[in-house]
Amino acid sequence: MIKYIRNFSIIAHIDHGKSTLSDRLIQTCGGLNEREMTSQVLDSMELERERGITIKSQNVTLNYKSKSGQPYQLNLIDTPGHVDFSYEVSRSLAACEGALLIVDVTQGVEAQTVANYRIAKEMNLKIIVALNKIDLSTADPNRASQEIKNIIGIDVNNAIQCSAKTGYGIPELLECLIHDIPHPQGDPCAPLQALIIDSWFNQYLGVVSLICIKNGKLYKGDVLKSMNTGQKYTVDQIGIFTPKQVKREILDCGEVGWLVCANKNIIKTPVGDTFTLSTHPAKKACHGFKKLQPYVYAGLFPIGSKNQKIFRDALYKLSLNDSSLFYEPERSEFLGLGFRCGFLGLLHLDIIQERLRREYSLDLLVTAPMVVYEILTIDNRIIYVDSPSKLLSLTKIKEIREPVVLCNILLPKKYLGEIISLCIKKRGTQIDIIYHSTQVTLTYELPMSEIILNFFDQIKSASHGYASFEYKFSRFQRSNIVCIEILINKKRIDALTVITHQEQSIYHGRLLVNKLQKLIPRQQFDIVIQATIGKRIISRGIVKQLRKNVLAKCHGGDITRKKKLLYNQKEGKKRMKQIGNVNLPHTVFLAVFDVNNNKK
């Protein structure tokens, strides 16, 4: 019955114990036996276990018998805590009626704690606070409770103290979940409405979709229709995760489960769409969720032309599992065919690159990451560019606008000076400052290009690891942006072009030329490296040629003989420079990435 179903997510800042708590809930409810239990059960990717972070939201259906003896079905969705994967949180919460907000009592409230709370509050979810890691000697539940009250504004009198590691407080937490979180409000007799929360590619089953039954019931063999595209699909298999993949004949109203269709072209149905029955369709779609636009773009080029098809197919499959991943074909004069890909941040880029390497054995060259710029032309047209080549191809530019983010930084008071200095260095504008008992919330407007690269590391370094931040796109702002092009022996290398602010261009150009001087191997002729903005050369360097000692066998004798040998060598080097090709190793392209990370 629907009144005994509870759908909830676990939300928290990174490293506050979400995945460990999920493990303990699964173990307590008997989802897996002792032999099958491993740490981070729901972190199915090897990459997630290695890094100790949750990348993809995961779902598990648990059977729990309350203290009164009434059986309940709990649908738990574990979510990521890193700012780059906040879109996964909003997608997961769309299927829930409640959220479990975890706060590490050794760390207190951090930026993503506040951000995730706001997302849940906007969706009108019932929020239960759990104070985790209560077993540690450094635990300070009173301080954590005070911070929750002061910074977030939640009454913490009913907060549950627990330890996901030892299991302390887990029974009380489960009882609180079933009593405080409301059951799904759907109608089992209404026309089917199934919200697609996620999808991924399985090499045996094809495309698997994670769905939440908002209204009606879903049976194996039903013919579904997408309310977005109108396409029809036949249900081949349905089931739930316990966390094992268990097949079922029916998914009832309020349940969260998986779906496999006989039609393989389900790929065209986007995450956030609604399925309904083709014979008895619903009148309107479920309220979905807005697909986030990528913040960071980079060119990905496979090493070796034979890998082109594998690379295209790999991106196709990964985009099913990750709806925020954008890609389109791109051609570079120097690197050949590849794809221009969009990401939510540098960690997202790093994860995708690592998955392509591990899951598809692809070695890739990655060009310098950049943000999207808004271009206003003389005839008042708005154009968005995500690559240096697109910006260079435009003429009649009236102004270039860069994206600006609203950044909230939560930090201890004693590090306030260092963090403000860092924000000023990053061209930031202070919007607000709020003092709490021991912490401060700083609100700054910062250019997104300054945030995406190494701001996270710098803010952690300036605060000795205690500061945390979250950000969201605010607007586009007029800015003095320039393209730095790299010429090697007067030949433009498009893959090394970078976009930067005018103030940093000279420093950036010199740094890039110096890096390239060290990385390009010496050859039989001089290699001239130039960094240019338009027709102006802002930096120049030379990789000196290798020279054979042609005078080694001349012991004394007429000086004209020596001059002739040196002249012939000089002329030979000239001819070689005209027809010779400069071989650039792969490390050269990594230098551009490194230069971006070394911005002032």
UniProtKB/Swiss-Prot annotation:
GO terms for cellular component: plasma membrane. GO terms for biological process: positive regulation of translation. Keywords: Cell inner membrane, Cell membrane, GTP-binding, Hydrolase, Membrane, Nucleotide-binding, Protein biosynthesis. The keyword Transferase does not apply. The keyword GTP-binding applies. GTP binds at D15, H16, G17, K18, S19, T20, N132, K133, I134, D135. It comes from the Bacteria. It is a peripheral membrane protein. Transmembrane segments: none annotated. Its main location: membrane. It is found in: Cell inner membrane. One of its GO terms (molecular function) is GTPase activity. Residues 3-185 form the tr-type G domain. Its EC number is 3.6.5.n1. It catalyses: GTP + H2O = GDP + phosphate + H(+). Signal peptide: none annotated. Belongs to the TRAFAC class translation factor GTPase superfamily. Classic translation factor GTPase family. LepA subfamily. NCBIfam families: lepA, small_GTP. Required for accurate and efficient protein synthesis under certain stress conditions. May act as a fidelity factor of the translation reaction, by catalyzing a one-codon backward translocation of tRNAs on improperly translocated ribosomes. Back-translocation proceeds from a post-translocation (POST) complex to a pre-translocation (PRE) complex, thus giving elongation factor G a second chance to translocate the tRNAs correctly. Binds to ribosomes in a GTP-dependent manner. This is Elongation factor 4. It comes from Blochmanniella pennsylvanica (strain BPEN). The lineage of its organism: Bacteria, Pseudomonadati, Pseudomonadota, Gammaproteobacteria, Enterobacterales. The gene is lepA.
